[in-house]
Amino acid sequence: DSLTFLDGQNNQISLNDFNGKLILLNFWATWCAPCKEEMPSLDLLQSNKKLDNLKIFPINVGKDNSEKSTVFFKDLKIKNLNPYFDSPKTLAKKFGLRGIPTTILFNKRGEEFARIIGSTDFSDKKFIEWLSSYN
């Protein structure tokens, strides 16, 4: 069962196209303060040399349009990530999200192996060490 979501141009993205990659889905919205707090460290994580096999998809589950999300990223000086969209809320339902931010990690075989509920510091050394063992 393929997991799909949209990019900023309304193109459908399928996680199946990223088999063999370490995948991080981060569910967020522009009105969510903790999401705003963690996004810069998530951005840095995408450019971490130890995690060259990592692909991060920040998926907006709010009612925010692409423009609003782009401005949100620009204001936070996000350079390594692009906003994606869960429209209509398929993934939020599929994963039974209870709140945001929620981060879900998938190994190279596409299996979920971890879930972080609430905001986190993605630049934490222990977290990066742990994650790089899946890279």
Model features per residue range: what roles?
Residues 26, 58-60, 115-117:
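Soluble periplasmic/extracytoplasmic beta-strand elements of cell-envelope proteins
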Residues 14-36:
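Short active-site neighborhood of thiol/selenol oxidoreductases, capturing the structured segment around
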Residues 36-76, 87-94:
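Structural microenvironment flanking redox-active thiols in thiol-disulfide oxidoreductases
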Residues 18-21, 51, 78-80, 97-98:
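Active-site acidic short loop of glycosyltransferases
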